[in-house]
Amino acid sequence: MGLNITGLIPKHMENRGKLTLKENLKIIENILEQRKAPENGIDEEHIKLLLRLLSFMDTDKDPNVVQIGEREARVYTKLQRDGVFDFCHGVGRSGNLIDPQPKAPGASVMYKLTNKLLESFLKALGLKVNAIATPVATGMSLALCLSAARKKYNSNVVIYPYAAHKSPIKATSFIGMRMRLVETVLDGDIVKVEVSDIEDAIRKEINENNNPVVLSTLTFFPPRKSDDIKEIAKICQDYDIPHIINGAYAIQNFYYIEKLKKALKYRIDAVVSSSDKNLFTPIGGGIIYTKDESFLKEISLTYPGRASANPIVNILISLLAIGTKDYLNLMKEQKECKKLLNELLEDLAKKKGEKVLNVENPISSCITTKKDPLDVAGKLYNLRVTGPRGVRRNDKFGTCYLKEYPYDYIVVNSAIGVKKEDIYKVIEKLDEVL
């Protein structure tokens, strides 16, 4: 950035000032040149500077522009501009979410940069995939994936290993596809879906001349166990049918990442994760990633119209602010907090004559309760504890089990961002109400 300040101040001061400016701009230049998530997070002032410089490239910032279109990024207040970081034109074009927008060169660069940083971030965690940030959350991102499967592979029925998650069910309904549920079975305390039952469902649909797509679940509340995505991916490869994975909070723990790495050797068309659950953004954005670049392109083509830049910018801000080094530290802290949660729950269970359920989940734990679990969860809420989930044994949706589950229970989470003091406090409150 050339600034002519010659003669305004002494030469030695001019040189010193230009050096400082150059070093500050170098941080921005490095982001644009390297196009990788930084190892160490960048401070907010430099992030704001980057966003401001990019937004100044959009045509609505041109002081001599003549605006005669029906969509010219006209907003009434500065408050509205601030809400989208001044990217009022949004992202994408009517035919493709990731296409550059002629009226918004800056927003187009911002979106492309976000996707590049997102791919490098996932690579730093061990996932060598293509990725896009989406302007919609998990459920609608799943709908985009299913819509793309319908368009590319003529899929007309979703094979869904049953999980009590409304988003995938509504996503399927939203795009007008039929869903075939595969029932869960009880294995000790765990609720799971047998891979053989999934294959049976696939075979039946194919025999009826249908084109199934499998929507498996990697992350969910216990006692529902993660689907065996590696074996499902093998089956989908054998039958040559698409496979979408709901991995809402898969990025935050290596337990899930390792499962993904193994499964990605076989048939996975797309994985969907949440930006708020993994990247500390406000709710509203999603992350879709896959090794199949052509299918990712197909997904972007299913989005109708332009989109708000807000969820995309929030993902970019998180990637820049956190940095890969601090994110790995946050993952480590999450694992330590989960270990502490398990230990304290075991002590509490012994004290109260309850049981910590033996479930395979690196994020959440379950403790039984002789009291009404909904009442317990309600009391925790009134004690200013948010997040615990009370489930009655006969709640077929809550337990993910279509028969009666053996226990009433409370689910307590230890997701990324939680602190040890939060764990101690929730156990203290649980002690009061159990």
From Swiss-Prot:
Binding-site residues for pyridoxal 5'-phosphate, renumbered to this chain: R71
Cofactors required: pyridoxal 5'-phosphate
Catalytic activity: O-phospho-L-seryl-tRNA(Sec) + selenophosphate + H2O = L-selenocysteinyl-tRNA(Sec) + 2 phosphate
Pathway(s) per entry: Aminoacyl-tRNA biosynthesis; selenocysteinyl-tRNA(Sec) biosynthesis; selenocysteinyl-tRNA(Sec) from L-seryl-tRNA(Sec) (archaeal/eukaryal route): step 2/2
Residues the UniProt record annotates as site (May act as a substrate filter by repelling compounds with a negatively charged alpha-carboxylate): E70
Enzyme class: transferase
Self-association and partners: Homotetramer.
The protein's name: O-phosphoseryl-tRNA(Sec) selenium transferase
Organism listed in the record: Methanocaldococcus jannaschii (strain ATCC 43067 / DSM 2661 / JAL-1 / JCM 10045 / NBRC 100440)
Lineage: Archaea, Methanobacteriati, Methanobacteriota, Methanomada group, Methanococci
